[in-house]
């Protein structure tokens, strides 16, 4: 009888601990979604402010660049389209999101310089800090998803493709400045989508349609 009571106590404690972890992970997921939403909205505002600051001739030049044909993040293997995203596991979506956020830690410093003269985007230097915080949160979610298993994602060891390209951004040309802003917006939209679907994956009864 005593042994049964001890066993029951252990089971109850384990359940409470697991419930606490699940609650913490849910809060972390919600915070991650909110943070990347803010970054996506900030990216959209930066592009609008950038375009508003241009002369008519410069805007005509931009019309020749858009739609955007290439971003350096295209090197990162990621789900494309709604169907592939919805079929991806929560762990895969978290890993891709981590990779995309990580890839912007260095170029976000150039991004800050691109919009440093804007008075409406707040302090652009905070973008790098926001990315670092989001990266840390996603890393914790990945570890929780692995539940003690080793991380076997080969892509984690691949070099990031951004650093050399953005070293050429020193001339701050119109084309490259716009490309940088547009790519940042594109990638933040990706991460927002992936995190939303990954968060939805936590509930088996949820309809995770996009």
UniProtKB/Swiss-Prot annotation:
Signal peptide interval: 1-22
Disulfide bonds: 71-183, 200-208
PANTHER family the UniProt entry points to: SOMATOTROPIN, SOMATOTROPIN,PROLACTIN
Annotated residues for binding of Zn(2+): 38, 192
Gene that this polypeptide is encoded by: gh1
UniProt keywords, alphabetically: Disulfide bond, Hormone, Metal-binding, Secreted, Signal, Zinc
Predominant localisation class: secreted
Entry's localization field: Secreted
Family matches, as InterPro entries: 4_helix_cytokine-like_core (IPR009079), Somatotropin (IPR034975), Somatotropin/Prolactin (IPR001400), Somatotropin_CS (IPR018116)
The name this protein goes by in its record: Somatotropin-1
CDD domains: somatotropin_like
One record GO biological process: positive regulation of receptor signaling pathway via JAK-STAT
Highest taxon, organism lineage: Eukaryota
Gene3D superfamilies associated with the record: 1.20.1250.10
Natural source organism: Carassius auratus
Gene Ontology CC annotations of this record: extracellular space
A GO molecular function held by the record: growth hormone activity
Function: Growth hormone plays an important role in growth control and is involved in the regulation of several anabolic processes. Implicated as an osmoregulatory substance important for seawater adaptation.
UniProt family annotation: Belongs to the somatotropin/prolactin family.
